[in-house]
Regions:
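N-terminal pre-domain segments of enzymes
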Residues: 4-45, 172
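A short Gly-Trp-Pro
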Residues: 26-28, 39-44, 48-82, 88-177
């Protein structure tokens, strides 16, 4: 199937609402600790009061951060990136790269189970939207123009992420390259 240069959405997965899902959990050092079945969060009335206006707009209303504008988009500090809404671990600094776009970009998620994708035809474009698998928060978009080894670029809104640095003692032992 010709995808017009975009990721084939026939493999995109959006979990059904109001069901339990299986996600991969991670230690504070970013190491997988096992799969866990948890309930999806499809509606949480406290999101508007718990999130900043920008994070709410991005995650719940599918807005986009302005490029180069949100603190942390270009951080090189070792750590993990969690969903700002529900805390699900999504990405690692080890897969982060500078795409020059002004948004955090990753070659892959930490665990495929923790994200969902679906076709996005908004604004007259054909894209693949990236969402948190647990709470359906809009994270950003997936493009087929990333570096090796995946060739993918997960272009993610910084306002949708909560960065958690690795513990200082684990950075020296496990994360030096």
């Amino acid at each position: 199937m010709d995808t017009g240069g975009f990721v084939d959405s026939s493999s995109a997965q959006t979990p059904p609402p109001d069901t339990s899902i299986t996600i991969m959990e991670f230690s504070p050092e970013g190491k997988p600790t096992g799969l866990r079945s948890i309930d999806r969060i499809t509606d949480d009335p406290s999101w508007k009061s718990r999130l900043s206006p920008q994070s709410y707009s991005v995650t719940r209303r599918h807005a986009t951060d302005p490029p180069f504008a949100v603190a942390g988009y270009d951080s090189k500090e070792p750590g993990i990136y969690r969903c700002i809404c529900c805390g699900t671990v999504l990405f690692s600094s080890g897969a982060k790269f500078d795409s020059g776009t002004g948004w955090p970009s990753f070659t892959s998620p930490l665990a495929q189970e923790n994200i969902a994708t679906r076709e996005d035809l908004s604004y007259g474009m054909r894209r693949i939207e990236v969402l948190c698998a647990r709470c359906d928060a809009h994270m950003g978009h997936l493009f087929p123009d990333g570096p090796p080894p995946t060739g993918l670029r997960y272009c993610i809104n910084m306002s949708a992420l909560d960065f958690v640095p690795f513990p200082k003692d684990s950075v020296k032992k496990d994360h030096q390259e």
